[in-house]
Protein backbone atom coordinates (compact mmCIF):
# COMPACT_ATOMS: atom_id res chain seq x y z
CA UNK A 1 0.00 0.00 0.00
CA UNK A 2 1.22 3.46 -0.87
CA UNK A 3 -0.25 6.80 0.17
CA UNK A 4 0.90 9.91 -1.68
CA UNK A 5 -0.25 13.50 -1.33
CA UNK A 6 0.39 16.17 -3.95
CA UNK A 7 -0.15 19.89 -3.53
CA UNK A 8 -0.58 22.47 -6.24
CA UNK A 9 -1.52 26.11 -6.48
CA UNK A 10 -5.10 26.64 -7.58
CA UNK A 11 -6.13 28.84 -10.44
CA UNK A 12 -8.60 29.15 -13.29
CA UNK A 13 -7.94 27.10 -16.42
CA UNK A 14 -8.62 30.19 -18.54
CA UNK A 15 -6.00 32.23 -16.64
CA UNK A 16 -3.40 29.69 -15.48
CA UNK A 17 -0.44 31.99 -14.78
CA UNK A 18 1.00 31.21 -11.35
CA UNK A 19 -0.92 27.93 -11.00
CA UNK A 20 0.68 24.57 -10.34
CA UNK A 21 -1.42 21.58 -11.35
CA UNK A 22 -1.60 19.10 -8.43
CA UNK A 23 -2.42 16.21 -10.80
CA UNK A 24 0.79 16.97 -12.70
CA UNK A 25 2.82 17.10 -9.48
CA UNK A 26 1.36 13.73 -8.46
CA UNK A 27 1.83 11.94 -11.78
CA UNK A 28 5.32 13.38 -12.30
CA UNK A 29 6.33 11.81 -8.97
CA UNK A 30 4.75 8.43 -9.79
CA UNK A 31 5.31 7.92 -13.52
CA UNK A 32 8.61 6.04 -13.29
CA UNK A 33 8.22 4.18 -9.98
CA UNK A 34 8.71 0.42 -10.31
CA UNK A 35 6.11 0.01 -7.56
CA UNK A 36 3.43 0.41 -10.25
CA UNK A 37 2.60 -1.86 -13.15
CA UNK A 38 3.71 -0.75 -16.63
CA UNK A 39 0.11 0.03 -17.58
CA UNK A 40 -0.22 2.41 -14.62
CA UNK A 41 3.10 4.09 -15.34
CA UNK A 42 2.01 4.71 -18.95
CA UNK A 43 -1.19 6.33 -17.67
CA UNK A 44 0.84 8.59 -15.36
CA UNK A 45 3.17 9.47 -18.26
CA UNK A 46 0.15 10.38 -20.41
CA UNK A 47 -1.21 12.61 -17.65
CA UNK A 48 2.19 14.31 -17.37
CA UNK A 49 2.18 15.04 -21.11
CA UNK A 50 -1.34 16.46 -20.85
CA UNK A 51 -0.59 18.64 -17.85
CA UNK A 52 3.09 19.54 -18.22
CA UNK A 53 2.05 23.07 -19.07
CA UNK A 54 -1.25 24.86 -19.44
CA UNK A 55 -0.77 25.78 -23.11
CA UNK A 56 -0.91 22.38 -24.83
CA UNK A 57 2.79 22.12 -25.71
CA UNK A 58 3.32 18.68 -24.16
CA UNK A 59 0.05 17.38 -25.60
CA UNK A 60 0.88 18.65 -29.09
CA UNK A 61 -2.14 20.94 -29.31
CA UNK A 62 -0.54 24.35 -28.68
CA UNK A 63 -1.96 27.07 -30.94
CA UNK A 64 -2.90 30.74 -30.75
CA UNK A 65 -4.39 33.60 -32.68
CA UNK A 66 -4.30 37.37 -32.51
CA UNK A 67 -7.91 37.74 -31.34
CA UNK A 68 -7.93 35.40 -28.37
CA UNK A 69 -4.31 34.49 -27.65
CA UNK A 70 -2.97 31.06 -26.82
CA UNK A 71 -4.89 27.88 -26.16
CA UNK A 72 -4.96 27.19 -22.44
CA UNK A 73 -6.30 24.36 -20.36
CA UNK A 74 -5.64 21.12 -18.58
CA UNK A 75 -6.85 17.64 -17.99
CA UNK A 76 -8.35 18.69 -14.70
CA UNK A 77 -10.23 15.72 -13.24
CA UNK A 78 -9.10 12.10 -13.04
CA UNK A 79 -11.09 9.51 -11.14
CA UNK A 80 -10.54 5.76 -10.81
CA UNK A 81 -13.76 3.81 -11.41
CA UNK A 82 -14.91 0.22 -11.45
CA UNK A 83 -17.90 -1.00 -13.44
CA UNK A 84 -18.32 -4.69 -12.73
CA UNK A 85 -15.10 -6.34 -13.89
CA UNK A 86 -14.11 -3.27 -15.92
CA UNK A 87 -11.66 -0.86 -14.28
CA UNK A 88 -10.78 2.48 -15.79
CA UNK A 89 -9.80 6.08 -15.12
CA UNK A 90 -12.40 8.66 -16.08
CA UNK A 91 -10.88 12.02 -16.99
CA UNK A 92 -12.17 15.44 -17.89
CA UNK A 93 -10.27 17.96 -19.95
CA UNK A 94 -11.01 21.67 -20.18
CA UNK A 95 -9.13 23.44 -22.97
CA UNK A 96 -10.02 26.93 -24.22
CA UNK A 97 -8.87 27.06 -27.82
CA UNK A 98 -8.49 30.14 -30.05
CA UNK A 99 -11.40 31.63 -31.95
CA UNK A 100 -9.75 31.34 -35.35
CA UNK A 101 -7.54 28.68 -36.85
CA UNK A 102 -7.83 25.77 -34.43
CA UNK A 103 -10.79 23.46 -34.79
CA UNK A 104 -12.01 21.56 -31.74
CA UNK A 105 -12.43 18.30 -33.68
CA UNK A 106 -8.84 18.48 -34.93
CA UNK A 107 -7.49 19.15 -31.44
CA UNK A 108 -9.63 16.31 -30.11
CA UNK A 109 -8.19 13.92 -32.70
CA UNK A 110 -4.69 14.85 -31.57
CA UNK A 111 -5.59 14.11 -27.95
CA UNK A 112 -7.15 10.76 -28.89
CA UNK A 113 -3.96 9.88 -30.81
CA UNK A 114 -1.73 10.94 -27.90
CA UNK A 115 -3.76 8.80 -25.48
CA UNK A 116 -3.32 5.82 -27.80
CA UNK A 117 0.46 6.21 -27.72
CA UNK A 118 0.30 5.51 -23.98
CA UNK A 119 -2.10 2.59 -24.23
CA UNK A 120 -5.06 4.73 -23.21
CA UNK A 121 -8.35 5.26 -24.99
CA UNK A 122 -9.80 8.77 -25.14
CA UNK A 123 -13.30 9.71 -26.24
CA UNK A 124 -14.27 13.32 -26.90
CA UNK A 125 -17.73 13.78 -25.39
CA UNK A 126 -18.27 17.51 -25.83
CA UNK A 127 -16.81 20.43 -27.77
CA UNK A 128 -18.06 23.89 -26.86
CA UNK A 129 -16.84 26.04 -29.69
CA UNK A 130 -15.38 29.47 -28.90
CA UNK A 131 -17.89 32.29 -28.86
CA UNK A 132 -17.05 35.63 -30.41
CA UNK A 133 -18.89 38.78 -31.42
CA UNK A 134 -17.10 41.39 -33.51
CA UNK A 135 -16.50 44.57 -31.45
CA UNK A 136 -17.84 46.50 -34.45
CA UNK A 137 -21.20 44.68 -34.34
CA UNK A 138 -24.29 46.70 -33.41
CA UNK A 139 -24.83 44.47 -30.37
CA UNK A 140 -21.40 45.14 -28.87
CA UNK A 141 -21.55 48.84 -29.75
CA UNK A 142 -24.91 49.16 -27.96
CA UNK A 143 -23.69 47.40 -24.81
CA UNK A 144 -20.47 49.44 -24.74
CA UNK A 145 -22.39 52.68 -25.20
CA UNK A 146 -24.60 51.83 -22.22
CA UNK A 147 -21.55 50.85 -20.17
CA UNK A 148 -19.77 54.10 -20.95
CA UNK A 149 -22.88 56.14 -20.13
CA UNK A 150 -23.35 54.44 -16.75
CA UNK A 151 -19.68 54.27 -15.67
CA UNK A 152 -18.28 57.35 -17.37
CA UNK A 153 -15.32 55.20 -18.47
CA UNK A 154 -14.04 54.96 -22.03
CA UNK A 155 -13.32 51.23 -21.84
CA UNK A 156 -12.87 49.05 -24.89
CA UNK A 157 -14.35 45.57 -25.39
CA UNK A 158 -11.97 42.63 -25.18
CA UNK A 159 -11.99 38.88 -25.67
CA UNK A 160 -11.07 36.43 -22.94
CA UNK A 161 -10.78 32.66 -22.72
CA UNK A 162 -13.61 32.04 -20.29
CA UNK A 163 -16.52 29.78 -21.13
CA UNK A 164 -19.51 32.04 -21.34
CA UNK A 165 -23.23 31.78 -20.77
CA UNK A 166 -23.67 34.13 -23.75
CA UNK A 167 -23.07 31.33 -26.26
CA UNK A 168 -26.48 29.92 -25.30
CA UNK A 169 -28.31 32.94 -26.73
CA UNK A 170 -27.85 34.24 -30.29
CA UNK A 171 -26.06 37.62 -30.38
CA UNK A 172 -25.72 37.80 -26.59
CA UNK A 173 -22.84 39.71 -25.03
CA UNK A 174 -21.29 38.70 -21.73
CA UNK A 175 -19.68 41.49 -19.79
CA UNK A 176 -18.95 42.59 -16.27
CA UNK A 177 -16.63 39.76 -15.17
CA UNK A 178 -13.58 42.00 -15.42
CA UNK A 179 -14.89 45.47 -14.76
CA UNK A 180 -12.29 48.15 -14.17
CA UNK A 181 -12.08 49.27 -10.55
Please provide the spans of the model-predicted regions:
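Structural signal for hydrophobic packing residues in well-ordered secondary-structure cores
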Residues: 30-38, 111, 115-119, 147, ...
